[in-house]
Amino acid sequence: ASDCMFGNGKGYRGKKATTVMGIPCQEWAAQEPHRHSIFTPETNPQAGLEKNYCRNPDGDVNGPWCYTMNQRKLFDYCDVPQCVSTSFDCGKPQVEPKKCPGRVVGGCVANPHSWPWQISLRTRYGKHFCGGTLISPEWVLTAAHCLERSSRPASYKVILGAHKEVNLESDVQEIEVYKLFLEPTRADIALLKLSSPAVITSKVIPACLPPPNYVVADRTLCYITGWGETQGTYGAGLLKEAQLPVIENKVCNRYEYLNGRVKSTELCAGNLAGGTDSCQGDSGGPLVCFEKDKYILQGVTSWGLGCARPNKPGVYVRVSRFVTWIEGIMRNN
């Protein structure tokens, strides 16, 4: 069942070794029947050009191919099926999260794929600049300020199922953005519709949305995740997590903390002693809280005063206040 591909199959590492016409593939390292100087294990060490398996080292839109054993046919495509979604419940990772306590300054590196709704929002050239959360196969929630650089969907792409920020694993999914939706009252929240649905796998699972207007109780322990490149605390490019308590708005708005700046459509979280904060996360990334048996997306990383400073908790968009808007956009688009 795993002998399938995502997208154009650039990351395909399966064992298919015949073309659509049934001709066996030539080994990538061999020079007969066809001599070739490009696409050998030496020229493309990252492309998985082992034995004579079908591969897509050049990202050909028609998918994986190989040089053939027929002297009259240099290369041909292979018939590799698209992977199909498995059904997993929202908010239930297939890998148990580490849940490292918030006393760890700056959080810790996450267990790979334990936060499977975390996405990386990238420029079209592949540079990571914001986080986001998969909330259904076709929809990602992020911060509106992440989309200030361009109003064109083509400027962005989404990477799903990643643990490393660079040197992406071969089975990550890379999907173009079809449309952007900014929240109409100018809240720092936005929806991205993907140009094709994500394939739901054990590494790519949506987070659950909260009930409308739900209020997370004071001192609930929640988790933020991200590659944390926002402030130069370099997590060696691996996904990080940090545990943070939610602070009720009444407390957060006290003079010694955020002094009345937090709106009812926002939520505070952080250790009032400082040390962990969404500098470790990413703008637009998730704040999730475990409830009963699943993780619920309660916050979108929005702003903070400085970074992990004492008495200055991070501020998140309160997702529950926008669930009605989110569900409406998803239903009508």
UniProtKB/Swiss-Prot annotation:
Keyword Electron transport: no
Site entry: Site of substrate specificity: D277
S-S bonds: C4-C83, C25-C66, C54-C78, C90-C208, C100-C108, C130-C146, C222-C289, C252-C268, C279-C307
GO MF term set: endopeptidase activity; serine-type endopeptidase activity; signaling receptor binding
Oligomer and partners: Interacts with CSPG4 and AMOT. Interacts (via the Kringle domains) with HRG; the interaction tethers PLG to the cell surface and enhances its activation. Interacts (via Kringle 4 domain) with ADA; the interaction stimulates PLG activation when in complex with DPP4. Angiostatin: Interacts with ATP5F1A; the interaction inhibits most of the angiogenic effects of angiostatin.
Purpose of the protein: Plasmin dissolves the fibrin of blood clots and acts as a proteolytic factor in a variety of other processes including embryonic development, tissue remodeling, tumor invasion, and inflammation. In ovulation, weakens the walls of the Graafian follicle. It activates the urokinase-type plasminogen activator, collagenases and several complement zymogens, such as C1, C4 and C5. Cleavage of fibronectin and laminin leads to cell detachment and apoptosis. Also cleaves fibrin, thrombospondin and von Willebrand factor. Its role in tissue remodeling and tumor invasion may be modulated by CSPG4.
Family to which this protein belongs: Belongs to the peptidase S1 family. Plasminogen subfamily.
Additional facts recorded: Plasmin is inactivated by alpha-2-antiplasmin immediately after dissociation from the clot.
Name of protein: Plasminogen
Organism from which the protein derives: Canis lupus familiaris
Encoding gene (name): PLG
